[in-house]
Amino acid sequence: MKQLQDIVKTLQAPQVTGNAAVEILDITADSRAVKAGSLFIALDGATVDGHNYVNKAIEAGAVAVLVSKIVEVSGDICVITVEDTRTAMMACVPYFFDYPANSMRMIGVTGTNGKTTTSHMIRHILKAQGHKVGVIGTVHIMIGDTSYPIHNTTPDVVDLQHILHQMVEEGVTHCVMEVSSHALALGRVSGVEYDTAVFTNLTQDHLDFHKTFENYLAAKCKLFEQVSAPNQTKSGKGAIINIDDEYGHRVIEKTTAPIITYSIDGKGTLNAHDVEMTPKSSRYTVSYDGHDYTVAMNTTGLFNVYNTLAAIGACLLEGISMEDIDKALKTFSAVPGRFELIEEGQPFAVVVDYAHTPDGLENILQTAKAIQENRIIVVFGCGGDRDATKRPIMGRIAAQYGDVVYVTSDNPRTEDPVQIVKDVEVGVKEGLREGSHYEVIVDRREAIQHAIKNAKPGDIVLIAGKGHEDYQILKDKTIHFDDREEARAALKEI
């Protein structure tokens, strides 16, 4: 809890009407979450204006409101007016929660692909060293060994600060956080001082939001600018950067923090080579600081070699020896929905993966090709109300690698799923190889069933797009749908 008059001191040029000598027990920008003693922040969003809910918040128990527009309020309420409530929120919310990020080592992982697996690898290594670790990411929030659901890769400012505060209260020493480009562009991570920033890669995604690739890159770079910004309260900063990525050098230019670069082409300070893979595992040599280490993992795919290097780099910055890192990695298991093998005793492989970008899809298809014994069968679709330009690109990639391609639905949202499939189909036709073929089955359940029913011994059935997700977003509702459950059900029918 904080005194409102102290909260007001964190704001720029506030106009205060009413009594500010009140105690604030909670702070929120969601009128539905208001309780007695709350400060309600009215945000003017893209679709909803919080100023329309000020009086609803007061009825629910708010004792003060933070606004940027003139509002008629009911009751004896303190009204704080600022130029921009979103900017004000970034200042006052971390203060309200006592700047929790300053009490933990904060490791931020950003990039188009690989954030989730890299974050979980870092957690696994840190935990093996006896640290209590928190994770905030696409799959869930973890505080120690307890998992909580999450709705955005990076929560909004209020939720994030509340989560970080809870982590501190429960004794977390290290927080590993996936930091999305949306969060960086919208200031959701304001008030969070990162100790380590990790860059995995950058390929086309989220252009529906960022509009241009340069804007997308600029958003990602904010994390690296932050770790070397002046007036920092913490020491021991560093950046881990994939130098094989074509944008790695651009990211390096944005930070003056100590850097570990990683590569599989021998270009980094941390390098992997002599990579051997099976459908379930990988083995390779990691070279660092003049020494070689053999790393054996229960994960496969070249993309996971990159993820492992990123995690190793982050943990080296935390002072963990390469020997201890190597020991911990031997017991790491794949993250749910990341090249996850579905096994029901069938004579072919079924893999479920979250790949939903052109690069992500190509990565898992390259892995499938490296370990294939027979055909590659691909089941995938593209999301509605998202970057439509990647649809034909992903269609072309699927056709270039797949022997059989099933184009289907994947969270069509408000768009017509048939039209989305047609957009994908343009690229499929361009990329189709001699001897390969494709089929359109808009119903995702039917597409999965058909792919598995027609699989032959030695085939790899790759179901891409959803991974760990257990829902399908339709025009007027969200239904339960889990690719892993659907695959298992289909396997039991053959």
Predicted regions and their residues:
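Acidic, Mg2+-coordinating active-site environments of NTP-dependent enzymes
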Residues: 72-75, 196-350, 373, 427-428, ...
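Glycine/threonine-rich flexible loop motifs
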Residues: 48-52, 186, 208-215, 387-390, ...
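N-terminal leader/targeting and accessory segments in enzymes
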Residues: 1-91, 95, 268, 294-296, ...
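Short secondary-structure boundary segments
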Residues: 67-70, 179, 201, 243, ...
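Phosphate-binding loop of NTP-binding sites
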Residues: 89-241, 247-255, 309, 371-372
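Active-site regions of enzymes building and remodeling cell-envelope glycoconjugates
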Residues: 75-83, 148-151, 256-261
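Short internal beta-strands
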Residues: 63-69, 238-243, 379-380, 403-410
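ATP-dependent carboxylate-amine ligase
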Residues: 1-15, 36-39, 313-323, 327-337, ...
